[in-house]
Amino acid sequence: MELGWWPQLGLAFLQLLLISSLPREYTVINEACPGAEWNIMCRECCEYDQIKCECPGKKEVVGYTIPCCRNEENECDSCLIHPGCTIFENCKTCRNGSWGGTLDDFYVKGIYCAECRAGWYGGDCMRCGQVLRVPKGQILLESYPLNAHCEWTIHAKPGFIIQLRIVMLSLEFDYMCQYDYVEVRDGDSSDSQIIKRFCGNERPAPIRSTGSSLHILFHSDGSKNFDGFHAIFEEITACSSSPCFHDGTCLLDSTGSYKCACLAGYTGKHCENLLEERNCSDPGGPVNGYKKITGGPGLIHGHYAKIGTVLTFFCNSSYVLSGNEMRTCQQNGEWSGKQPICIKACREPKISDLVRRKVLPMQVQSRETPLHQLYSSAFSKQKLQDAPTKKPVLPFGDLPPGYQHLHTQLQYECISPFYRRLGSSRRTCLRTGKWSGRAPSCIPICGKTENVSAPKTQGTRWPWQAAIYRRAGGVHGGGLHKDAWFLVCSGALVNERTVVVAAHCVTDLGRVTVIKTADLKVVLGKFYRDDDRDEKSIQSLRISAIILHPNYDPILLDMDIAILKLLDKARMSTRVQPICLAAPRDLSTSFQESRITVAGWNVLADSRSPGYKDDMLRSGVVRVADSLLCEEQHEAQGIPVSVTDSMFCAGRDPTAPSDICTAETGGIAAVSFPGRASPEPRWHLVGLVSWSYDKTCSHSLSTAFTKVLPFKDWIERNMK
């Protein structure tokens, strides 16, 4: 007996030596001891040591805290010397979470996991299971340790059942599911009737309870572990039990009861009865057309169609479908819609926005024609009485938009009096499915103006006169604001998108470099020099392109002509209309004998002068001068020039009043004579002011013009 305590004392002494050899991290003085089990040999205080140790066999370093007590010599005695304490008792790991043991939470309270995997909870992340009373939710068990045991109980509201779907399953497989498994019972306890056990990784079909609760048990043995499982559940109603047969659809009403919507061929409360199968007879294709099966099961023996068959109808060329394009075989054995017919018709021809169309009453051909009467006169009265006299009946029906019946007539006219029509004024739908005549179009009436009394032309508003402006930012000097616009010359509007102008107006001086389109603009409908006077009537248009004549010589100003393409169409009105183009052969008299009217603004006018606001478009009459005399006049002024074949010189007509200084306007020259389209006089463009030397605007000096007549073909090619 006396020797029996020596082994115990020796073991305790060895433990103390072992503890003293371990590194001490820190010591915490706690005024309250953790519990009665630690009060043996404890005095008024209780301290803790944090210990690091290495688990046997795993070489895994873990930590924990142990309490210690002060002895009579004020030394801290580890409580490991007491019975029941072993150094590796708490050498644990967090199998279902992340390590997080701190101070006494690790050893005393057992909380050594900072965060648990989904489905696990507790300080050691080993607790699982729950009682659930929600309409829907999920059960997720992420991974699992050995020898785990978890239970869940799901409760639904009275009158509802529970549907459980296992969407992920990863457990140890066994044919009997006796190692790792999920067990579902129809009730609220482990004694309820078992529905089935599940293991492996094959997801089962949805599970439904017969009552308002389900019990789920998870169990794992001590050999293997996998990823766990994930299930979702929800409360369901009477329809969830699939009371409708043959793929019928269950529909709940407000009272909680249900009705079944049956598929084709079934009837009854639960869609349990089979209807007698019905078919639709083949409707055939329309005359001058055909049909195709475009949906459903199709025809039976080529004569009958099953329920749901869809037919689509088509017409031959020059015929149009009137009626239902598609028909479906219905439950009652009848086709939907009405049988369509194919009608001879014409597609409406496309017209521009400038053309107005009117549909005239159809003129149906009959036997009451002069030819028929002549033919009938050769026969007896008896034979004539036997001949049909009624007008033939045409297959009328509703046509889709954009089509017209046979013999329909369309009448065309221009929407504005400032346009004239080209093409046919009336077209008829022919039996060929085409329209008679030519497609109509409307073009602006050119060269027409009012209130011009020759030879006096002052104060006339020439509607084709175009003012060409240039932005001051592209010109050096002059004292103009950077964004200001100034008038550089005049041009002639020849159609809705084209203006003819002298080439030197839109190029840099002495060069063929074209000014940027953004630095130029065209103003139409202008009369006064001051823009504010014409504010309501003018149209300010942007330029999309500038086309110089390829042979333009900026030094001699030979072929000084260019075309401006407008970005937007000019709107025709009494103030804006184009001028006509003419070839030399169109002139009724010799060009040299023509009285030519020149119009333009004074581009050099000073806006600060008193009469600036009242200054208007000026015009006057000139006559063609001899080219040799023109050259000699300028040579006498010290300016040797050459008048080429693309130019003509002209001076003021002393017999006609004039308020224009031709050299200052950069204007246009026009002649009035009857045109080809109308015997009425029309104004035609014949010239553009090109160059001159005339500081005093005297009658003796001539101005050089670009002759427009030779460039008619080039202009028309670029007008398209």
Swiss-Prot record:
Main location: secreted
Annotated disulfide bonds: 128-150, 177-199, 239-250, 244-260, 262-271, 280-329, 315-342, 414-442, 489-505, 630-649, 661-697
Residue span, CUB domain: 128-236
SMART domains listed in its UniProt record: CCP, CUB, EGF, EGF_CA, Tryp_SPc
Domain Sushi: 278-344, 387-444
Gene Ontology terms for molecular function: calcium ion binding
Subcellular location: Secreted
CDD domains linked to this entry: CCP (cd00033), CUB (cd00041), EGF_CA (cd00054), Tryp_SPc (cd00190)
Domain EGF-like stretches: 235-272
UniProt signal peptide: 1-21
InterPro entries: CUB_dom, EGF-like_Ca-bd_dom, EGF-like_dom, Peptidase_S1_PA, Peptidase_S1_PA_chymotrypsin, Peptidase_S1A, Serine_Protease_S1-Domain, Sperma_CUB_dom_sf
Keywords: Disulfide bond, EGF-like domain, Glycoprotein, Repeat, Secreted, Serine protease homolog, Signal, Sushi
Keyword Repeat tagged: yes
Residues of this chain annotated as glycosylated in UniProt: 451
Residues in Peptidase S1 domain copies: 445-720
Gene Ontology CC terms: extracellular region
Similarity remark: Belongs to the peptidase S1 family.
Entry function: May play a role in regeneration of skeletal muscle.
Protein name: Inactive serine protease PAMR1
UniProt organism field: Bos taurus
